[in-house]
Structures are given as C-alpha cells and as structure tokens.
C-alpha cells in the first residue's frame, strides 16, 4: 500500500538532499527532534512553522552552520558530513539569508564573483570577471549594471545579485530564508518568476515564509514543524486553516481578536505637526481604550509621523500632548517619561540591542528610572523582567540568553515587554507583526487588547490592510505626507482605504507605491 508521503512524491525525481531523523540540542534545550526532510530537483519545498519551531536551525544544518547531534544528512543518496558552509557550497548548497551577504561598496560583478575573482599574472582579470558575472545574471534573466555599486541598488535587485552569486558557484540547492520580507508586491512577482525559471532548470529549493498565500503560489509541497518536531508534509495548496492548525496545534477561530474596551478621554493629541519634506499639518487624537490605525502607501509619511511623535526625529512646528501635557519635540527621554512607548518598523536595527541579553533589552527604558543612588537595581530589574517575560510568554532558555538567539516573534514580544515594564500608556506601533507567524501575531494582538482594556491608547502603522481593518477602531489614511481622511474600521473595505491613500499622490508616485496599488487590486 502507498502511504500519503509516497503518493505525494510518486512522480517526483529522487531527492538530492535528505535530512534523515536529525536532532539538535543547545544545552538542555532540544531544538530539533528526529526531523526528516527531502529536497528534490526542480521542486520547491516550503518550510512552515511558528517562530521558534526550528526552521532556522534546520536550514543551518542543511548549509553547514550547525551539525546534527543525531541522525544523518545525505547528498545524492550518500551519507555526508557538512562541517562548515564551504563544504556545503562544494555540494552545491547555497543559502539566501534575510540579511544579504554582499559588500555594498563593491560592484555587482565583484559581488557575484566574491571570493572567486579570476586573475591573470596575479592581477584581477576584470574582463573575465564581468563575463562570468553576466553569465550568472543571464541564468535568471535579470538586467543589472555590472559596474553599479551594490549599495546603490534596492533590496530586490541586491537579492537577485545574491541568487546570481549562488548560481555562479553551481548551486543545485537554494535555501530561501524569508526572501519576500522586505519586497513590494511587484518585486515578489519578479522573484517568483526567477524561482519558476530555476525550477525548470532543475534547481531544488527550500522556501521559508510566514505568508501562506506565497507558499500556495510558489511551493510544490510544504513540511510543517512544531516545537522542533516534524508534523506533516502536504501539497502546498492545502487549505490555509488546516496549515495554521498543524503549525500552532490548535484552530485559530479569529485571526484579528479585537476586544471592545470602553473608549475614554484623549490620551494622545497631535496638533498641526509639520516637518518639511516629510509630512504636513498632521493632527490626530487617540483616546484611552482605542486603537487608531495609520494606513497609506509606501512613502506616505506614516513612519516619519510616528518617529516624530516618539521624539526620535525633530519637527519644524506643531504640538504633541500626552494626557494633557505638552511634550518637548525631538526628545525621546521626555516622551518615555510621559508614557510613550515606540516599537519601530525594523526591530533588529532600531528596536533591539542584539548583542545583549533578553533581560537587558526588556529593561532598556527603565534602567535609569529604577536606579538607586545612581546604581542600577539589578535584582529588582531581574524580578520585573522575569514577570513580564512570563506574562507575555516569551520563549527563551533564560533571561540571560542573547536576544539575537530568539525567534522573530519572541524578539518582538520582548520589545513590547520593554514598554509594559516601563508602564507606558501610549503605544506607537510601526509594523508590529512584520516577520512573525500567525500564532505570534495573535499573541501580539492580545497584548494590544490587554493594554487598551487597561485604558491605554495605541496608534498603529501597518502595511497589511486586513490587520488595520481587523484591529483598529478608526483608520486615518495618509497620502502625500498629509492625512487624507478618516474611516471607521467597521464596514470599511480595502477599496475605501486605497481610494484615500492615492488621493494626494501625484505623477511622482514611487514604484513601491504603484506595486501596493496593484497588489490590493489582485487581493480583491
């Protein structure tokens, strides 16, 4: 009798990379437990799981960064040891990370051939270098100026350079780790065209994404992990609700569980805020118990407004008032002292100190205010951090663990925890669920609910319109650096939001913004 996995692959070629019952532990923590994965030529295997499920550890074993404690890795059916990334590359295994491995000050051609520069008589043979780099770019059909500095390119183009670099090393297996995280809809379309081309050439691919629609669109099969365990391998077009159930171990009945707290007095008031070249005449109010969404296209000025309210950036004129008190502009410590907490759009670059512990990151906003006689109250800080970490269910080995070791969802909960610890009653959220899985998103929404139920106020920027419509009470829509209008979340459609979002946009609309408009049309 043919089992379901055999039926799934009965017409597929034999795998070129296999993980056979591999396990991996870090100290007492068992991260991967007897997981088996097959990667096949000309196929895309999507790897799905919550943050912390073990996806990153698994791909690091595939690429030679980690070695399994148990089980074995097979390449072309033969047991193989991958002690380092160079060995993995020699077998044709290449990884495209979220943080691209390129040198910004070097040219496209030099980056494609990085570490393998052709030489003649001891000197770089630039003619040969450009020829080889062009051949690699031709494989994916991308037209990029070979002499352009990589740092001058957008993220999508840099990603194509990274893929070309992998192919120039004769990669047979491409591991794509969250490749769409920083891309617009149009750029994602271009990436997926390249993936389709590579499939036709017989390249095997492992694709990691939190976006279930992308998995159905580009994957052939999907392997689901949960808590380091292999749960199932299924066709990539499996119903999304079923994938979520397998991934989190339960059904999520309400993806946007907005509570209905009593709306109180204004907590945050912004009056006639202006910053030349960024935004004009911004006025808004957020009341106690309320979530106000801030929507708009890329470049509309949403992030700039939030940063200015938080005191990160200075403004030319206008007022920010919290609980009746006018704040000094451009003063972060003043904003924090008066109850403002800011969660930036890029948590790794702006929201965390990656080299520090979970405990230190949780306490960043309160170290000074809780000091005694000028000395940090380490004991008290540890106790408070432990309470917040438990309350927010931050998954970690200990408070002393480097925050860089945590999954994206747990890192984001730690940033929230910092402001819970600080007692902030006004939260400014910029893309609060970017790069986190479905289960972690719901946990973050519940944190937002709990804060508003206690009388807090939330101003939330999000590029995901379903999130704005599902979690906000009111929606302010920005267009061309101005607030173009206000909509009640109840009964409002994505069409309604987009109509306001493009109302002030002129002929200089960015490519990213145009892509957002097209994507919204497609979603409908």
Curated annotation (Swiss-Prot):
Residues annotated for ATP binding in this entry: 49-56
Gene Ontology CC: plasma membrane
EC code(s) of this entry: 7.5.2.7
Keyword Membrane appears in the UniProt entry: yes
Catalytic activity: D-ribose(out) + ATP + H2O = D-ribose(in) + ADP + phosphate + H(+)
InterPro entries: AAA+_ATPase, ABC_carbohydrate_import_ATPase, ABC_transporter-like_ATP-bd, ABC_transporter-like_CS, P-loop_NTPase
Keywords assigned by UniProt, alphabetized: ATP-binding, Cell membrane, Membrane, Nucleotide-binding, Repeat, Sugar transport, Translocase, Transport
Keyword Translocase assigned: yes
Topology term for the membrane: Peripheral membrane protein
Superkingdom to which the source organism belongs: Bacteria
ABC transporter domain ranges (all copies): 17-252, 263-505
CDD domains in the cross-refs: ABC_Carb_Monos_I, ABC_Carb_Monos_II
Assembly information from the UniProt record: The complex is composed of an ATP-binding protein (RbsA), two transmembrane proteins (RbsC) and a solute-binding protein (RbsB).
Family: Belongs to the ABC transporter superfamily. Ribose importer (TC 3.A.1.2.1) family.
Function: Part of the ABC transporter complex RbsABC involved in ribose import. Responsible for energy coupling to the transport system.
Protein name according to UniProt: Ribose import ATP-binding protein RbsA
Annotated organism of origin: Corynebacterium glutamicum (strain ATCC 13032 / DSM 20300 / JCM 1318 / BCRC 11384 / CCUG 27702 / LMG 3730 / NBRC 12168 / NCIMB 10025 / NRRL B-2784 / 534)
């Amino acid at each position: 009798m043919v089992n379901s996995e055999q039926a799934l692959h009965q017409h597929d070629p034999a795998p070129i990379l296999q993980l056979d019952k591999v396990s991996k532990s870090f100290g007492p923590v068992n991260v991967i437990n007897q997981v088996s994965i097959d990667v096949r030529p000309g196929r895309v295997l999507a790897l799905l799981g919550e943050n912390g499920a073990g996806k990153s550890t698994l791909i690091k074993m595939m690429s030679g960064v980690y070695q399994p404690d148990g089980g074995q890795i097979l390449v072309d059916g033969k047991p193989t040891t991958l002690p380092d990334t160079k060995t993995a590359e020699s077998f044709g295994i290449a990884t495209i990370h979220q943080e691209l491995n390129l040198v910004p000050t070097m040219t496209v051609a030099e980056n494609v051939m990085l570490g393998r520069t052709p030489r003649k008589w001891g000197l770089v043979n630039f003619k040969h270098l450009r020829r080889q780099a062009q051949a690699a770019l031709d494989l994916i059909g991308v037209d990029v100026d070979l002499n352009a500095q990589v740092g001058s390119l957008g993220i999508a183009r840099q990603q194509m350079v990274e893929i070309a670099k992998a192919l120039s090393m004769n990669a047979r297996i491409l591991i794509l780790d969250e490749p769409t995280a920083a891309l617009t809809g149009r750029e994602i379309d271009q990436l997926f065209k390249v993936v389709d081309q590579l499939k036709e050439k017989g390249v095997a691919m492992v694709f990691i994404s939190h976006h279930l629609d992308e998995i159905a669109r580009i994957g052939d099969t999907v392997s689901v992990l949960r808590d380091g365990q292999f749960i199932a391998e299924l066709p990539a077009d499996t119903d999304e609700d079923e994938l979520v159930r397998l991934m989190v171990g339960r059904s999520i009945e309400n993806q946007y569980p907005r509570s209905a707290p009593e709306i109180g007095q204004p907590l945050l008031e912004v009056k006639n805020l202006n910053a030349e070249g960024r935004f004009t005449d911004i006025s808004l109010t957020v009341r106690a118990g309320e979530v106000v969404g801030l929507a708009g296209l890329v470049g509309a000025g949403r992030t700039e407004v939030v940063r200015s309210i938080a005191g990160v950036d200075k403004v030319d004129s206008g007022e920010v008032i919290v609980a009746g008190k006018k704040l000094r502009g451009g003063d972060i410590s003043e904003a924090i002292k008066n109850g403002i907490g800011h969660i930036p759009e890029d948590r790794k670059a702006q929201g965390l100190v990656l080299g520090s512990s979970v405990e230190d990151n949780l306490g960043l906003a309160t170290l000074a205010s809780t000091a005694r006689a000028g000395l940090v109250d380490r004991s008290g800080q540890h106790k408070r951090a432990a309470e917040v970490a438990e309350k927010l269910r931050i998954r970690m080995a200990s408070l002393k663990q480097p925050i860089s070791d945590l999954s994206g969802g747990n890192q984001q909960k730690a940033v929230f925890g910092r402001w819970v610890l600080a007692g902030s009653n006004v939260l400014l959220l910029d893309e609060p669920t970017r790069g986190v899985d479905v289960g972690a998103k719901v946990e973050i929404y519940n944190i937002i609910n709990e804060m508003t139920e206690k009388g807090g106020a939330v101003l939330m920027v999000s590029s995901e319109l379903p999130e704005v419509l599902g979690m906000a009470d009111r929606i302010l829509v920005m267009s061309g650096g101005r607030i173009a209008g206000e909509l009640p979340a109840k009964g409002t459609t994505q069409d309604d939001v987009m109509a306001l979002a493009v109302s002030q946009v002129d002929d200089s609309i960015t490519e990213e913004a145009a892509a957002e408009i097209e994507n919204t049309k497609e979603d409908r």
